[in-house]
Amino acid sequence: MNFEKVVERICDFIRGVVSSSGSTGVVLGLSGGVDSATVAYLCVRALGSERVFALIMPETGVTPEQDVEDAINVAESLGMEYKLIEINDIVRVFKEKAGEGSKIAEANLKPRIRMVLNYYHANSMNRLVAGTGNKSELMVGYFTKYGDGGVDFLPIGDLYKTEVFQLAAYLGVPRRIIEKKPSARLWPGQTDEEEMGISYAELDEILKLIEKGERRDDEKFRRVVQMVERSRHKREMPPVARVRDLL
């Protein structure tokens, strides 16, 4: 990877998106993971720290304290303004009013609450919400629809997870963040690779084959293809019933 050119291209993209929208900057959710840290580094490089605002939104009992510490360290080292909002009370009140849901519904509630907080602050500040999703997650639908998928633009959305690790190291993201097991922190002890049943290295290898139109005759390949196909609705605008020809 030509890191210098990749960073230059992404920074130009960030500046262009913000400028064309008439926004004053960006808001992003900073989790303490490698994706959000990488996006923070890129946004600050593109716009300057004064135009990047971070929200750190842990769930006590689920989010490890190290994640919170890492997120704060990233924000402070980059000179970004940030706010820490624990989401436990919001989750509790929501469930009291809406009633108990299934495990997956309650897990997806957390990123959807974080999305609302991102946009609440972005609207108040006339800013855009910077997404932190990578190409691997986008292709297989490993994100919550209208949760962490609810963003205005995706700086690292064309980089596979394994490439994000490389870019993070180039940008100077702390080593302990890069080496951390990727996790959406949907429940205690949850990790991305265990939930998907495949490592990011294996996943990216298969996704690159799919992108090239090549195939492989094994169960893992077929399962990844199925993940891509079943999550198509997450990557597209809602379908519209066409009736104009009847009017």
Curated annotation (Swiss-Prot):
Alphabetical UniProt keywords: ATP-binding, Ligase, Magnesium, Metal-binding, NAD, Nucleotide-binding
Gene Ontology molecular-function annotations: ATP binding; glutaminase activity; metal ion binding; NAD+ synthase (glutamine-hydrolyzing) activity; NAD+ synthase activity
Domain of life from the UniProt record: Archaea
Binding site for ATP: G29, L30, S31, G32, G33, V34, D35, S36, T132, K161, S183
Any one of the GO BP annotations: NAD biosynthetic process
One GO cellular component, as annotated: cytoplasm
Swiss-Prot/TrEMBL catalytic activity: deamido-NAD(+) + NH4(+) + ATP = AMP + diphosphate + NAD(+) + H(+)
Record pathway: Cofactor biosynthesis; NAD(+) biosynthesis; NAD(+) from deamido-NAD(+) (ammonia route): step 1/1
Cross-referenced Pfam families: NAD_synthase
Top-tier EC class: ligase
Record: residues binding deamido-NAD(+): R112, K145, D152, H233, K234
Annotated positions binding Mg(2+): D35, E137
InterPro entries tied to this protein: NAD/GMP_synthase, NAD_synthase, NH(3)-dep_NAD(+)_synth, Rossmann-like_a/b/a_fold
EC number per UniProt: 6.3.1.5
Quaternary structure and partners: Homodimer.
Described function: Catalyzes the ATP-dependent amidation of deamido-NAD to form NAD. Uses ammonia as a nitrogen source.
Annotated family: Belongs to the NAD synthetase family.
The protein, known as: NH(3)-dependent NAD(+) synthetase
